[in-house]
């Protein structure tokens, strides 16, 4: 009988220790997810989810066990964009890919990692400017402004060459911070509304726009770059290239070009499930929760719940080293030639 008491006390101690290490009360985090997820309405009956979470959390022995309880909820919500960062380690629910799909995407995924924060521009035949915008994972204000300014300057440097159109390549843009991306591409977008964040019912939460060359979201001016004059390319035709690695802020940047006049989308749809807007929530000093709380709509309020579609579908191998041999770039040049 005494041994049984020790066992009960030991299990209680393990459970208490796990909860003590987790920097928030698990029930409060669960309730927050349940009532604030943009996908909440997709679960018609929450009782089985409630019961499953209660059972799983009662068996949690470590912080990782506790986080796995929340990942199970994200799985049931089919939410692949939300994730936790605990002491620098990332935890999320990600859909498995078959070996053939992964083999096809692996070179692009690898390149998207090696080219982070490395813009690339060049003049192609026909006076078409090619602009590659990869992931930009910077969040400090000075870094955001530095990258926004750099991208802006990389675009406007072609003013004297009188370009006839642009190709904006987002195929290596798997996410990061959209503020420097959109401000930097302001000369192409113009001073205008770019899109909206909406709740699960499509009601506007906040508006995105370019004002005086800087990105503004919900009235907050997110960048402070020096302008070289009014947007000079806002009326030129633009071909936007996307693919299955384009996601998160890469998808947001694509949406900002949707409904822009004289604009076409070429390639493949963006990564499925990464078109939600994530809020940033902290718990103590060790836990960060990037949580999908809004959908995103373009300037005409068309919502993109799952992915950003293309106008011209081309499923072919990418050739970033020989752009004139790249099937999507060739299609973009052909489309721009007729404009």
Residue ranges and their predicted role:
Residues 20-210, 216, 252, 278-288, ...:
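Flexible, low-complexity junctional segments that flank or bridge functional domains
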Residues 1-22:
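Bacterial Sec-dependent N-terminal signal peptides
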Residues 179-324, 335:
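Conserved acidic, small-residue-rich alpha-beta core segments centered on
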């Amino acid at each position: 009988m005494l041994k049984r008491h020790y066992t009960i006390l030991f299990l209680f101690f393990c459970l208490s220790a796990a909860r003590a290490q987790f920097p928030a009360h698990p029930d409060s985090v669960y309730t927050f997810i349940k009532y604030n997820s943009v996908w909440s309405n997709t679960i018609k009956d929450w009782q089985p989810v409630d019961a499953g979470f209660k059972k799983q959390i009662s068996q949690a022995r470590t912080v990782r066990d506790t986080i796995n309880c929340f990942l199970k909820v994200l799985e049931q919500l089919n939410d692949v964009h939300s994730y936790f960062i605990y002491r620098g380690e990332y935890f999320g629910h990600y859909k498995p890919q078959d070996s053939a799909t992964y083999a096809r995407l692996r070179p692009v995924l690898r390149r998207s990692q090696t080219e982070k924060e490395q813009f690339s521009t060049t003049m192609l035949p026909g006076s078409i400017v090619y602009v590659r915008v990869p992931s930009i994972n910077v969040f400090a204000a000075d870094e955001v402004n530095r990258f926004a300014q750099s991208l802006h300057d990389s675009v406007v440097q072609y003013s004297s060459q009188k370009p006839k159109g642009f190709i904006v390549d987002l195929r290596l843009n798997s996410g990061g911070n959209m503020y420097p991306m959109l401000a930097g591409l302001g000369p192409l977008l113009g001073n205008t509304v770019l899109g909206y964040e909406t709740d699960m019912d499509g009601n506007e939460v906040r508006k995105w726009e370019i004002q005086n060359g800087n990105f503004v979201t919900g009235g907050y001016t997110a960048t402070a770059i020096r302008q070289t004059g009014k947007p000079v390319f806002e009326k030129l035709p633009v071909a936007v290239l996307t693919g299955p690695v384009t996601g998160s802020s890469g998808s947001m940047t694509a949406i900002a070009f949707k409904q822009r006049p004289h604009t076409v989308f070429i390639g493949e749809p963006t990564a499925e499930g990464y078109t939600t807007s994530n809020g940033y929530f902290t718990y103590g000093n060790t836990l960060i929760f990037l949580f999908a709380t809004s959908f995103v709509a373009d300037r005409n309020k068309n919502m993109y719940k799952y992915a950003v579609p293309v106008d011209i579908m081309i499923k072919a191998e990418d050739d970033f080293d020989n752009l004139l041999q790249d099937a999507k770039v060739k299609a973009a040049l052909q489309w721009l030639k007729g404009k």
